[in-house]
């Protein structure tokens, strides 16, 4: 099964069709837009301070202005581009592919002087691999508390970086094995700086593991799908690795979804429904006594912070987003999600 993942990353560029590449280009635009917009977020500033303090060879660009070693650039850019939680989502993968993979691809592409086309192709094939790892782990992995953006996503970052570094299939196997002992990220971080940090960890792990494998660093023979490998260790009861066919018989990345609101994707159906409803149009929040919503129960463990304390937590609050939507706030504006709005008395009364 790991061989199938490796084969995806090694596919000749001439065999990659235009449609998935077009979606990869759209996601490059989406990712860079989110990254540039996120550069003034406190977590982005702090990570650039970390990067400046560590120094190192200026081989890769950081969003916000500086050049640092590739692994650090991937860390900072991954977290920065996820800071606003406005980036794309792939629901079969159960995570955000662009923020965890593109920063790794960009950092290595700069170092290798690769073309934009080579970087985009590496991203796409890395994403296809990450989607299949995510599908194999299944939704139970996410429901158990793991953030697939950072777990399954790290393998996609490793594949993308490894392709750009020119790793052969054996080196790619070792890179995935190293990633298996590095990949991490928890959903308990949602609503904090730790969530975007997960995306940065994914990208940085990809750069590190692919680079080490290129230097001859070895790992267990099959750290991804093998006995006591990453997937098996994360399955309930540590069972045998099963799941969907992993071959690249069709491209899954075009199922990627793009956000229209600057908050958790799980809140978007509610926002869209309330915006389309005329039942409460023009009614002051204080005059609304109650109303009911139905949603998939899985989202209650993701974006149901009852009393958000920060702008980041507002992005994961049914209560706050319902009130904001009903009173006509522009939830597409990322500048709206501040610590000030988390403390608004009107929204607090509505949430009760």
Regions found by a protein language model. Name each.
Residues 93-98, 146-151, 260:
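Short helix-coil transition sites and intra-membrane helix breaks within transmembrane domains
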Residues 24-28, 100, 118, 122, ...:
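Residue-level detector of well-ordered alpha-helical segments, enriched
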Residues 77-135:
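Hydrophobic alpha-helical hairpins/lids featuring a short glycine-rich hinge
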Residues 27, 99-107, 128, 152, ...:
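Short amphipathic alpha-helical face segments that pack within enzyme cores
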Residues 110-113, 117-208, 215, 220-227:
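Glycine-rich, mobile lid/loop segments that gate access to catalytic sites or pores
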Residues 1-94, 191-204, 211-352:
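Terminal-appendage/accessory-domain detector
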Residues 81, 100-102, 107, 129, ...:
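Short connector loops/turns at beta-strand edges and beta->alpha or beta->beta junctions
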Residues 107-111, 164, 273-276, 328:
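Active-site catalytic microenvironments for nucleophilic, acid-base chemistry
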């Amino acid at each position: 099964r790991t061989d199938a993942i490796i084969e995806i990353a090694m596919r000749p560029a001439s065999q990659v069709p235009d449609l998935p590449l077009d979606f990869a280009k759209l996601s490059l635009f989406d990712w860079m837009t989110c990254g540039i917009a996120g550069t003034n977020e406190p977590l982005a500033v702090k990570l650039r301070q970390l990067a400046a303090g560590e120094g190192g060879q200026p081989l890769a660009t950081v969003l916000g202005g500086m050049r640092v070693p590739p692994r650090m650039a991937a860390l900072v850019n991954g977290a920065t581009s996820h800071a606003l939680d406005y980036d794309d989502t792939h629901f079969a993968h159960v995570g955000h592919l662009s923020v965890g993979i593109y920063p790794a691809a960009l950092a290595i592409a700069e170092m290798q002087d690769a073309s934009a086309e080579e970087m985009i192709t590496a991203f796409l094939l890395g994403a296809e691999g990450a989607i299949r790892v995510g599908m194999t782990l299944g939704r139970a992995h996410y429901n158990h508390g793991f953030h697939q953006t950072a777990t399954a996503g790290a393998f996609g970052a490793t594949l993308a970086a490894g392709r750009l570094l020119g790793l052969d299939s054996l080196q790619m196997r070792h890179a995935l094995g190293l990633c298996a002992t590095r990949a991490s990220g928890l959903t308990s971080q949602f609503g904090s700086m730790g969530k975007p940090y997960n995306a940065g960890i994914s990208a940085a792990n990809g750069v590190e593991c692919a680079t080490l494998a290129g230097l001859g660093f070895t790992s267990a023979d099959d750290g991804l799908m093998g006995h006591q490998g990453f997937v098996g260790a994360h399955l309930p009861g540590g069972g045998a690795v099963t799941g969907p066919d992993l071959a690249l018989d069709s491209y899954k990345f075009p199922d990627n979804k793009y956000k229209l609101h600057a908050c958790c994707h799980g809140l978007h159906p509610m926002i869209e429904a309330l915006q389309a409803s005329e039942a409460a149009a023009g009614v002051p929040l204080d005059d609304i006594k109650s109303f009911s919503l139905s949603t998939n129960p899985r989202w209650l463990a993701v974006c149901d912070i009852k009393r958000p304390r920060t702008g980041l937590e507002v992005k994961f609050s049914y209560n706050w987003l319902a009130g904001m939507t009903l009173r006509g706030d522009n939830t597409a504006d990322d500048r709206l999600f501040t610590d000030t709005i988390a403390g608004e008395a009107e929204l607090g009364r509505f949430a009760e």
